[in-house]
Curated annotation (Swiss-Prot):
Binding site for substrate: R140, M317
Catalytic activity of the protein: L-alanine = D-alanine
Annotated protein name in UniProt: Alanine racemase
Gene: alr
PANTHER family assigned to the protein according to its UniProt record, in alphabetical order: ALANINE RACEMASE, ALANINE RACEMASE, CATABOLIC-RELATED
Group of enzyme by EC: isomerase
Upper lineage: Bacteria, Bacillati, Bacillota, Bacilli, Lactobacillales
Length: 378
């Protein structure tokens, strides 16, 4: 997708906020516990390489991504730190990961059996580093049964030139919820399955941001620190208090491209779902649903000159309209996410109106919106 460099619409990334959010968590960790920065999905829309650079400066010792392509992107950018792919990678690509010392998750002996000939075909490669995924209640990937796990471990031990168990992990489904009943059940199952291993691997990890923030006693010797890097509370506002203040890193700003006066009954946008109630000033903002500004945000608001201005009419692919308190010239600043005067719109505000989570809003902001760092970290 083409980046809109010649359009007044910018995602601003505060690098100092990212540094703060990581450094404060690193300071809370036990000495033996490492922090891997989760930079999947282009670092939740913040820019993978930008965040990786700041995370490394802040004390992160490794990275987690979702797909092999993201891991290769880090290697191409000369990041030599450990990189763990969190999603299942097709077995035919096992040799690519091994060649780049990229760690992969394993959820079945079948995957190991399929990857074996791929790795045997290139005997010069180092053993593939694998992390055994344990499904303790997330229901996504991982071993659930004792015997299945034992069989996989035995297979790995029988092929030491092709595989090495570097880690074991699980993922909690409710770490961000006030009720920890299910969370504790998952902890118990994880401990049971880990105790089946002949020895503990280098990395034993269970903690995402929510787990590390609110259940730090469960941290193994590595945490997968994700959404909190970006200053977003993993729970939304279900658990409003965090051990230290999280600083939001992302803001979204634009400008008016056009302003006009309309009169009572005049229609705005597709379907004419909004008609002016009287003489009104309508401004046009050059962002639309093709940029990830969701169509269902009609009726929400943005900030102009420190004032809330309602989004009127349907949001178009590339533009939307707002009702202004007075006439403003083209070029007037518009804040979609962030501060203007004494007012602020957060990603969580946008998410609540959209009936979703702030993770999704951040990830939905498309590459067409140019990204720009503020408060850069050397």
């Amino acid at each position: 997708m083409t980046i809109g460099n010649f359009r007044p619409a910018t995602v601003l990334i505060d690098e100092t906020a990212i540094l703060h959010n990581i450094q404060h968590e690193v300071a809370r960790l036990k000495k033996q516990t490492q922090l891997f920065a989760v930079v999947k999905a282009d670092a939740y829309g913040h820019g993978m390489l930008r965040v990786a650079r700041v995370a490394k400066a802040a004390g992160a010792t490794g990275f987690c991504v979702a797909i092999l392509d993201e891991a290769l992107g880090l290697r191409k950018a000369d990041y030599s730190e450990p990189v763990l792919v969190l999603g299942i990678v097709p077995s035919q690509y096992a040799a690519i990961a091994a060649a780049q010392t990229i760690s992969l998750p394993v959820s079945s002996t079948e995957w190991l059996e399929q990857a074996l000939p791929v790795l045997e075909a290139q005997p010069e490669l180092p053993p593939l580093r694998i992390h055994l995924a344990l499904d303790t209640g997330m229901g996504r990937i991982g071993f659930t049964e004792d015997q299945a796990l034992k069989t996989a471990v035995a297979f790995v031990e029988a092929h030491p030139k092709q595989f090495v168990i570097e880690g074991v992990f699980t993922h909690f489904a409710t770490a961000d919820a006030p009720d920890d009943t299910y969370f504790k059940q998952q902890v118990d199952k994880f401990n049971h399955l880990v105790n089946l291993l002949p020895s503990r691997p280098r990395y034993v990890h269970v903690s995402n941001s929510a787990t590390s923030l609110w259940h730090a006693a469960c941290n193994g010797n590595m945490i997968r620190y994700g959404v909190a890097i970006y200053g977003l509370n993993p729970s939304g506002d279900a658990i409003p208090t965090t051990p230290f203040p999280l600083e939001p890193a992302l803001s979204l700003k634009s400008e008016l491209t056009y302003c006009k006066q309309v009169h009572a009954g005049d229609g705005i946008s597709y379907g004419v779902t909004y008609r002016a109630k009287g003489d009104e000033f309508i401004g046009t903002v050059p962002i639309g649903y093709a940029d990830g500004w969701l169509r269902r945000l009609q009726g929400f608001h943005v900030l102009v000159d420190g004032q809330y201005c309602e989004i009127v009419g349907r949001i178009c692919m590339d533009q939307f309209m707002i009702r202004l308190p007075k006439a403003y010239p083209a070029g007037t600043k518009v804040v979609l996410v962030g501060q203007s005067g004494d007012q602020e719109i957060t990603l969580l505000d946008v998410a609540k109106y959209s009936k979703t989570i702030h993770y999704e809003i951040a990830c939905n902001l498309t590459p067409r919106l140019k990204r720009q760092s503020v408060n850069p970290v050397d």
